[in-house]
Amino acid sequence: MRWLFWSSGSQQAPNNKDNNNSNNNDDDDDDYDNNINKRPPLTPESPSPSHPPCASCSTQATASFSNPRRDWNTSLTAHDWAGEFKDPRNLIPTLLLTGGILFCVRIHRQYLRRIPLATNISPTYFHKRSLFGRVTSVGDGDNFRMYHTPGGRLAGWEWLPFRRVPRVKKELKDRTIHIRLAGIDAPELPHFGRPAQPYSHAAHTWLTNYLLNKRVRVFPYRQDQYGRVVATVYVRRFPWIFLRRDVGLQMLRAGMATVYEAKSGVEFGGEGKESKYRRAEEVAKRRGRGLWKGWKGVGWESPREYKNRMAGVEGEKAAAAAAAAAAAAAAAAGVGGMGELGVNGEKN
């Protein structure tokens, strides 16, 4: 049984060692507490025991607190700003931000800037770019006014509070573009002292029902002598909202206009469009649509013939008025000359 006592003794030895270690640790803790209690309290004048005093550090601190007004030029030039800007971490974001701002400005000027009047349209638009807007009024059978809305609904028009098309006539003054339909000529309404041409009210009513308050796409070609923009106009109408329709072509098919006839300066938007317009006019003429009803009868005249006749009448009136004015002036001069002579034919 001796080996049992030996084994039990070997097992108790570590326990005794652990007890001794715990006792030693307790003694060390007591010594540490005593040393802390015996250490004098720190004061602003006394240095930290773990950090010995440094003469250079105290000098720098004293200088910084004693002179609050520092030399800013020295402090700014002391930093390597050029190196900071050349750092890719700063240079790349700066270039991206600057490029993005310039790109947005260019997009706004080229595509999102609103054009208030026809006279504000740059010649760079003609035959190259288009305008998008809403029709606010129809003045005649072949012209109307449009409020330019660049970008359409994608740019916030019609649904953002600050991008609304005005409805009041007073608010639309000097803010709409006057459009003249290219390639067609509709009967004239009464204006400038001229009487109305047959089917002029019908053509005006047709165009009003077709375009008023609709969004249209305008392809400008030039400005005419009245400050209007001669352009081809497209509109989308229900139920064929995915198919845009040429407004001038639709008027020719309905017999509400004729192909514009002039010696020079006629805009169609291309030779192909002119031939298409003439075919549509020929079909409407054969079927007697609109103003082509009874066009073979006596007294019928096209819009161009009406304009030529009215121009002749106005020319005759102007010539007669000029002759009457000259005769009156001559008569007044003759009466004045007779008054200057005496009874015996001598001057007074």
Curated annotation (Swiss-Prot):
Pfam families referenced in this protein's UniProt entry, alphabetically: SNase (PF00565)
Biased composition (Low complexity): 15-24
Enzyme class label: hydrolase
E.C. numbers: 3.1.-.-
Membrane topology: Single-pass membrane protein
Localization terms from the record: Mitochondrion; Membrane
Membrane-traversing stretches: 91-107
Catalytic residues identified in the record: 180, 188, 228
Positions of the TNase-like domain: 129-294
InterPro entries the record matches: SNase_OB-fold_sf, Staphylococal_nuclease_OB-fold
Keywords, in A-Z order: Calcium, Endonuclease, Hydrolase, Membrane, Metal-binding, Mitochondrion, Nuclease, Transmembrane, Transmembrane helix
Binding of Ca(2+), residues: 185
Segments of skewed composition (Polar residues): 59-70
Location of the region described as Disordered in the Swiss-Prot/TrEMBL record: 1-70
Highest taxon of source: Eukaryota
Family recorded in the similarity comment: Belongs to the LCL3 family.
Cross-referenced PANTHER family: EBNA2 BINDING PROTEIN P100, SERINE_THREONINE-PROTEIN KINASE 31
Protein name: Probable endonuclease LCL3
